[in-house]
Amino acid sequence: MLVILKENIRTLGKLGEIVKVKPGYARNFLFPQRKAVKATKESIAKLEEQRSFLEEENIRKLNLASELAASFAGKFVILVKQASEDGKIFGSVTTREVARSLSQEYEVDHRKISFNGVKIRNLGEYQASIEFHSEIVVQVAVHVVRSETDAHELRQVKSQSQKSQQQEAKQNEVGEATDSDKADQK
């Protein structure tokens, strides 16, 4: 089945492209979420009329997503789970749990989060991908710990490391400013 994409979809193509997909994928996913329309002469003509509006809308969404992604720099999630002595947790970590943990500061749809094919069933540190836009994906560290005390200690370590990184960045900015001042004087 030929469809016209109404937005960029990483696995299919860009806005306005005509692509061939399986009928079930179109009926069950693309059409209900208004990501595509069936390619007919009428829909192609209508798309040409709306192309500039759709492109502007896509740029607006991209800008919003990039601002949101920038605010996620250095973010991490700590989840407390019951685990056996060898570190295996009872059950597994889900995207809903990560979204719930992030919801204290941000509103993130759990369907936009993935663990890159990894099942989180042990204690430790993992990476989760959050897709804000088809072109913008942010990595967030997910720490799975056994107790609240472990979580508290990890938060302290992370906050100290972030403070030291911020101080280093400020020192680098000051160093660059003095280097440029010296270059201007010569």
From Swiss-Prot:
Keywords: Ribonucleoprotein, Ribosomal protein, RNA-binding, rRNA-binding. It comes from the Bacteria. Residues 153-186 are annotated as: Disordered. Gene3D superfamilies: Ribosomal protein L9, C-terminal domain, Ribosomal protein L9, N-terminal domain. PROSITE patterns: RIBOSOMAL_L9 (PS00651). Belongs to the bacterial ribosomal protein bL9 family. This is Large ribosomal subunit protein bL9. It comes from Wolbachia sp. subsp. Brugia malayi (strain TRS). The gene is rplI.
